[in-house]
Amino acid sequence: MAKKKRTRGPKREKRIVPVGVAHINSTFNNTIVTITDPEGNVLTWGSGGTAGFKGTKKGTPFAAQLAAEMAAKKAISEYGMKKVDVLVKGPGPGRETAIRALQAAGLEISLIKDVTPIPHNGCRPPRRRRV
């Protein structure tokens, strides 16, 4: 029996989002850059892993730079983005590098805000490592 040919529906037209929000989540192991519209709907993202790094190299500033560049270039080309507000979360080494990479890629940064969660004496932290 011949296979039925599946027809695709109409392709979604790309919407233009001139202003967005870049969320940079920087941990010691990885840096994830997510670019959203002002409502919070994800448009594009990049991380140390999607930039081609594995293991401990994902946490490096260079991996964060490449991840931010990838996300920014896609946001500019596909969504016509020009301006971003940057929300930085976490203590990782890729924080500043990712912000610089967004600026170098051609996005105008209008606001940088640190939204790292700080406990008001919440859960007990893990024990100190003895190396």
Swiss-Prot record:
Function: Located on the platform of the 30S subunit, it bridges several disparate RNA helices of the 16S rRNA. Forms part of the Shine-Dalgarno cleft in the 70S ribosome.
Family membership noted in the UniProt record: Belongs to the universal ribosomal protein uS11 family.
Subunit structure: Part of the 30S ribosomal subunit. Interacts with proteins S7 and S18. Binds to IF-3.
Protein's gene: rpsK
PANTHER family: 40S RIBOSOMAL PROTEIN S14/30S RIBOSOMAL PROTEIN S11
Sample GO molecular function, one term: structural constituent of ribosome
Gene Ontology CC: ribonucleoprotein complex; ribosome
Protein name: Small ribosomal subunit protein uS11
Gene3D superfamilies linked to this entry: Ribosomal protein S11
Keyword flag Secreted: no
Keywords: Ribonucleoprotein, Ribosomal protein, RNA-binding, rRNA-binding
SUPFAM superfamilies per UniProt: Translational machinery components
A GO BP entry: translation
Biological source species: Dictyoglomus thermophilum (strain ATCC 35947 / DSM 3960 / H-6-12)
Keyword Zinc-finger among UniProt keywords: no
Family annotation (PROSITE patterns): RIBOSOMAL_S11
